[in-house]
């Protein structure tokens, strides 16, 4: 299949030129290109056009899952008939294993896996192995810690009508593929009923596979509704992929066990004069070996990944990139933040594991379950497009002049020129500006503070004045962060104060004011790149305004003003030449998509916007009601609960 782009609009402004240049660069095998596009210029739409033109499997990397979710939603709309997949961390909660030597504290790995995201991850790898019209959106931190594609594909099971499959052996094979026998129809399970085997793939929630046999001969294969098991499509063959990325063939598992034991013997000899560490390592590793031998899995199995891939110490680990073919297209979004994250991940992982290995909690091979170094990652950059409004030196140097600018916005809105006001009395002045805008409906204000404490104090001050304000910084727990962002999108918050709001992907057309406090305090979040990015947050509103509160102009402020004026001049000249009047973006705030009405309302659904916690409870409630209805053979009712659960999950995915 080929990528089929669907959009209600056509490329305009400088988008056609950018699309043509980037497409030609990919076709000419240019290793690196930069799309330097202003905020709101339609960079995602441009990339979608390039993907459709070159028709290659594509990986889009974002630096956090908030941005990844936004990109996933957009590409899903552009390519409704293609395999657009989402690959992020499947942990709702994750505490990595660690040992603090100074106070002899061992912290065991603790985690909570999100089943829905696990399904999406498995769906992503299935698609890239089967289809070339696959686009995967991923956060950069989660492409690691995944089993090898060779082991994964070797455990896939191809079933063909007319072939004999001894039923007992087939059931045994399904268990080895991490499917469980169960009478309840849910993901990663199978059930036997007479001459029928129903399989519920780990990567599907809308389809089940029904196999019908005569003795041991497979007579039919149907894709069926997982609740009613009514057939949707009959096929002559199907490939069933494993229920986990960590499955391994038995021969590989046996070889890995031998290799682990050899390393254990070497390490026990190393700890000869340290009996505590020696005993600890022996018992922990021996227990893991027994678990792998009996079940094919153990807690922390990723720490033995080198033994399963049979690679030498220090070799690059397998990752999501290995699942892609050689000619894939790599798009690195917000590259000025994503590339530094790739560089930093290896160092952070190594320092955490150092004490675990040194004190006998892990074998040295645990070091090889790690992120790629930047040099290792670059070997995958055969065809890469860096996307950023402010690309860094790395991207500019690696692109060797292949830089495509996209300055014009489809809306015709020019870059706002920052207004500089004194930092003295900045909070009082800010309050006056906020009150002006709150008299207009649906306008929002972003405030950038220099410290977490100042963000909290300003939020408290505004709240006392009955202004709907909230603060957001790195000290906020993930669940609370999600709630705040959803409240902002749903209109429950008018003013958001933060230290680094760039990472949140807040591109809201309702934002009419961006105020940067203490803009003259030169540093990371007051650099030219950051200031330009902050200004872009107001460039989606016709009346967008940016205020720098500064007592003097720093070099970063001067460079920001110069670049903003350059872009604004180009934008205004184009508007004048083409008789364009700036117009606002039509972009509705995300609403509750849970369906109402229909054939028969099985349960009243709350009309008010739901928080993350409320959605999670609602999903669990619908799941229980769905299973109860299915077990009672009330399949129409169960299907309605399934649809409601799916809609709630989609909203939760968007908000997270």
Swiss-Prot record:
Every copy of the UVR domain together lies at: 616-651
Query: A single GO BP annotation from the record?
Result: nucleotide-excision repair
Q: Name one GO cellular component term.
A: cytoplasm
Motif segment (Beta-hairpin): 90-113
Where would I find the Helicase C-terminal domain in this sequence?
Answer: 426-589
Q: Which residues form the Helicase ATP-binding domain?
A: 24-409
Q: Name one molecular function that GO assigns to this entry.
A: excinuclease ABC activity
Q: Give the binding site residues for ATP.
A: 37-44
Q: What is its main location?
A: cytoplasm
InterPro entries, per this entry?
Helicase/UvrB_N, Helicase_ATP-bd, Helicase_C-like, P-loop_NTPase, UVR_dom, UVR_dom_sf, UvrB, UvrB_inter
Protein's cellular compartments? Cytoplasm
Q: Which UniProt keywords apply?
A: ATP-binding, Cytoplasm, DNA damage, DNA excision, DNA repair, Excision nuclease, Nucleotide-binding, SOS response
PROSITE patterns annotated for this entry? HELICASE_ATP_BIND_1, HELICASE_CTER, UVR
One Pfam family, short name: UvrB
Role summary: The UvrABC repair system catalyzes the recognition and processing of DNA lesions. A damage recognition complex composed of 2 UvrA and 2 UvrB subunits scans DNA for abnormalities. Upon binding of the UvrA(2)B(2) complex to a putative damaged site, the DNA wraps around one UvrB monomer. DNA wrap is dependent on ATP binding by UvrB and probably causes local melting of the DNA helix, facilitating insertion of UvrB beta-hairpin between the DNA strands. Then UvrB probes one DNA strand for the presence of a lesion.
Q: Which family does it belong to?
A: Belongs to the UvrB family.
User: Its quaternary structure?
Assistant: Forms a heterotetramer with UvrA during the search for lesions. Interacts with UvrC in an incision complex.
HAMAP family in UniProt: UvrB
Q: What is stated about domains?
A: The beta-hairpin motif is involved in DNA binding.
Q: What is this protein called?
A: UvrABC system protein B
Give the source species.
Answer: Chlamydia abortus (strain DSM 27085 / S26/3) (Chlamydophila abortus)
Q: Which gene encodes it?
A: uvrB
């Amino acid at each position: 299949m080929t990528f089929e782009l669907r959009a209600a609009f056509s490329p305009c402004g400088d988008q056609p030129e950018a699309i043509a240049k980037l497409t030609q660069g990919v076709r000419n095998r240019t290793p690196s290109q930069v799309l330097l596009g202003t905020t709101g210029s339609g960079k995602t739409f441009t990339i979608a056009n390039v993907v459709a033109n070159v028709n290659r499997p594509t990986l889009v990397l974002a630096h956090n899952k908030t941005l990844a979710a936004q990109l996933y939603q957009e590409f899903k709309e552009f390519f409704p008939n293609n395999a657009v997949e989402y690959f992020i961390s499947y942990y709702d909660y994750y505490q990595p294993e660690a040992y603090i030597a100074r106070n002899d504290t061992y912290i065991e790995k603790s985690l909570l896996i999100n089943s829905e995201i696990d399904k999406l991850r498995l769906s992503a790898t299935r698609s890239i192995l089967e289809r070339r019209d696959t686009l995967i959106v991923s956060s950069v931190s989660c492409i690691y810690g995944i089993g090898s594609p060779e082991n994964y594909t070797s455990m896939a099971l191809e079933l063909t009508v007319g072939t004999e499959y001894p039923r007992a052996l087939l059931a045994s094979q399904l268990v080895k593929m991490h499917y469980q026998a169960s009478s309840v129809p849910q993901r990663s399970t199978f059930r036997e009923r007479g001459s029928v085997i129903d399989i519920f793939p780990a990567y599907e929630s809308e389809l089940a596979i029904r196999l019908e046999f005569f003795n041991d001969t497979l007579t039919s294969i149907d894709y069926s509704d997982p609740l009613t098991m009514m057939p949707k499509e009959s096929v002559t063959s199907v490939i069933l992929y494993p229920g986990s990325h960590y499955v391994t063939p038995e021969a590989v598992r046996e070889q890995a066990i031998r290799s682990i034991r050899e390393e254990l013997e070497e390490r026990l000899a190393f700890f000869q004069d340290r009996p505590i560490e020696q005993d600890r390592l022996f018992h922990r590793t021996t227990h893991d070996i027994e678990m792998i031998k009996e079940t094919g899995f153990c807690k922390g199995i990723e720490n033995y990944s080198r033994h399963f891939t049979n690679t030498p110490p220090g070799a690059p680990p397998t990752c999501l990139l290995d699942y892609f073919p050689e000619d894939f297209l790599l798009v690195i979004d917000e590259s000025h933040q994503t590339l530094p994250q790739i560089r930093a991940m290896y160092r952070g992982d190594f320092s955490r594991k150092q004490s675990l290995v040194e004190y006998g909690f892990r074998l040295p091979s645990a070091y090889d379950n790690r992120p790629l170094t930047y040099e290792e990652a670059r070997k995958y950059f055969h065809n890469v497009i860096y996307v950023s409004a402010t690309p860094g030196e790395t991207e500019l140097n690696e692109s060797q002049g292949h830089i495509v600018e996209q300055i014009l916005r489809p809306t015709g809105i020019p870059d706002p020129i920052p207004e500089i006001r004194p930092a003295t009395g900045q909070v009082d002045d800010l309050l006056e500006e906020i009150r002006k805008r709150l008299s207009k409906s649906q306008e929002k204000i972003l405030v950038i503070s220099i410290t977490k404490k100042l963000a909290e104090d300003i939020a408290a001050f505004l709240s006392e004045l009955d202004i709907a304000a909230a603060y957001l910084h790195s000290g906020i727990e993930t669940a609370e962060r999600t709630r705040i962002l959803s409240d902002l999108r749903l209109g429950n918050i008018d003013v958001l104060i933060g230290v680094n709001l760039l990472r949140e992907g807040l591109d809201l057309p309702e934002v009419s004011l961006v105020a940067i406090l203490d803009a003259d305090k030169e540093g990371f979040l007051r650099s030219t790149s950051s200031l330009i990015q902050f200004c872009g947050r107001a460039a989606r509103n016709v009346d967008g305004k940016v205020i720098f509160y500064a007592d003097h102009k720093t070099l970063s402020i001067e460079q920001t003003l110069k670049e903003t004026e350059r872009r604004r001049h180009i934008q205004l000249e184009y508007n004048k030449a083409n008789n364009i009047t700036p117009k606002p973006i039509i972009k509705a705030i995300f609403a509750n998509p849970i369906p109402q009405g229909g054939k028969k309302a099985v349960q009243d659904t709350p009309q008010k916007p739901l928080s993350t916690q409320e959605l999670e409870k609602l999903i669990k409630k619908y799941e229980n009601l769905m299973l109860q209805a299915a077990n009672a053979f009330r399949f129409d009712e169960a299907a309605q609960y399934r649809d409601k659960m799916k809609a709630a999950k989609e909203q939760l995915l968007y908000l997270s």
